[in-house]
């Protein structure tokens, strides 16, 4: 549990997670994370039991997970999702501060704001890596972890490593070129994803996020961290990424591996029905 000396939990906030309301509520929450002021765009639903924290990937927003309310497996369960700093509707006073460690601290501060002790977590791509680092730092708080193509090895940096492979004169030019390359990718839903990037991400955060993702993937011992977690885990990947070298290793070490058909890196765009079915099945039987 976060120390009360570090995080101040408003008494009125903790009650939000115990209401009987079943709809998602949108709100803004002001936080100070590592000296940077945030106005975090949050969607949440109260309920009974430990909440599910949803962390979106780079270039996406909290709305990737809004359909959770349509899934009966989550009826009555508290839900928390938000736009990461530099993404969506969240406002961040210092975009240059944003990195994976910064995103981990953002998650910890928001959990403290809602007085959350333990929780389930679902993270995609950048959000999966954020969730992994959070779970590694506080393993007793994480009840289960669904990692949707979040980084666990150097080979996972096919997007983020472009910050080194395709240098540009400035952040805006790199981002424009990145969008064009992504639009032309042969992976499912890449053009759809690329078309909204300008609206969902500030160019100024790209370098900090991508550089930290590459650094952690190359030198952060991520596979050991993931396999060492004591909670039930699932790794979800798209059919086009069947060639990931570590899938059998995950299975041999007790991680449930789930494959989404007709999908690359973005199951929430390519095959959301199957993605939600797999997520729901895991929450019903997490230890199988």
Q: Whereabouts are the PLM-identified features?
A:
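Conserved HGGG/HGGXW glycine-rich cap/lid loop of the alpha/beta-hydrolase fold
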Residues: 34, 38, 43-89
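Conserved alpha/beta-hydrolase catalytic His-Asp/Glu region
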Residues: 156-158, 172-228
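N-terminal cap/lid segment of alpha/beta-hydrolase-fold proteins
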Residues: 16-39
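Short N-terminal helix/helix-N-cap motif within the alpha/beta-hydrolase-1
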Residues: 62-66, 89-92, 156, 268-271
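Flexible "cap/lid" loop of the alpha/beta hydrolase fold
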Residues: 132-136, 142-174
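Conserved serine/cysteine hydrolase catalytic core
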Residues: 207-259, 268
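Catalytic histidine-centered segment of alpha/beta-hydrolase-like enzymes
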Residues: 263-276
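Active-site loop/oxyanion-hole signature of alpha/beta-hydrolase fold enzymes
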Residues: 33-36, 75, 80-122, 126, ...
């Amino acid at each position: 549990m976060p120390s009360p000396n570090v995080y101040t939990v408003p008494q009125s906030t903790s009650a939000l997670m115990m209401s009987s309301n079943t709809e998602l509520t949108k709100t803004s929450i002001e936080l100070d994370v590592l000296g940077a002021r945030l106005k975090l765009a949050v969607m949440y639903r109260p309920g009974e039991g430990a909440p599910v924290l949803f962390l979106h990937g780079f270039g996406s927003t909290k709305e990737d997970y809004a359909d959770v309310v349509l899934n009966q497996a989550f009826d009555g369960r508290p839900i928390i999702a938000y736009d990461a700093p530099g993404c969506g509707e969240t406002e961040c006073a210092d975009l240059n501060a944003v990195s994976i460690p910064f995103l981990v601290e953002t998650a910890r501060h928001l959990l403290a704001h809602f007085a959350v002790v333990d929780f389930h977590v679902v993270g995609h791509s950048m959000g999966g890596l954020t969730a992994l680092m959070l779970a590694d730092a506080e393993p007793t708080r994480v009840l289960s972890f669904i990692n949707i193509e979040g980084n666990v090895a150097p080979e996972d940096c096919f997007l983020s490593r472009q910050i080194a492979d395709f240098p540009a004169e400035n952040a805006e030019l790199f981002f424009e070129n990145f969008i064009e390359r992504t639009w032309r990718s042969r992976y499912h839903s890449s053009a759809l994803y690329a078309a909204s990037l300008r609206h969902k991400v500030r160019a100024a955060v790209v370098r900090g996020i991508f550089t930290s993702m590459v650094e952690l993937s190359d030198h952060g011992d991520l596979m050991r961290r993931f396999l060492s977690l004591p909670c039930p885990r699932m790794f979800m990947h798209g059919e086009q990424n069947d060639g990931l070298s570590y899938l059998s290793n995950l299975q041999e070490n007790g991680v449930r591996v789930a494959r989404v058909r007709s999908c690359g890196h973005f199951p929430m765009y390519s095959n959301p029905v199957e993605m939600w079915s797999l997520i729901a099945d895991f929450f019903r039987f997490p230890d199988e």
